[in-house]
């Protein structure tokens, strides 16, 4: 079932996601379409406070996933990329890196802030505040564990 992102994702006058609106609309669409097992929507796009088509800032598609996952209080948000999670070093420059299996939200945000390109620091904030874990997974190796980001230490 295709759910229209432009009817679910909205930003306020400060270009910040309107989480109350997003939660209300996501739950509305899920309740109106209960017979589907798979829901698809667009990432990165939204409407602004004036109803104009706009976009979320950097990390927009991952941000969309985290906003919707947090709004719906899902078990886990999955972000699929070309590497199996956060690594102990930057695999573009260091050979033989290994994925870190678990990180606290604060650790992941700090790594992202200081250059880990796999994740934008702001995109996991909705999941953090809602207590929904985020798992980073590899599209080229779907069986890999990846990295789980949560509030556990």
Feature names for model-found ranges:
Residues 1-124:
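Nucleotide/pyrophosphate-binding catalytic subdomain
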Residues 109-153:
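A conserved active-site cap/scaffold subdomain adjacent to cofactor or substrate pockets
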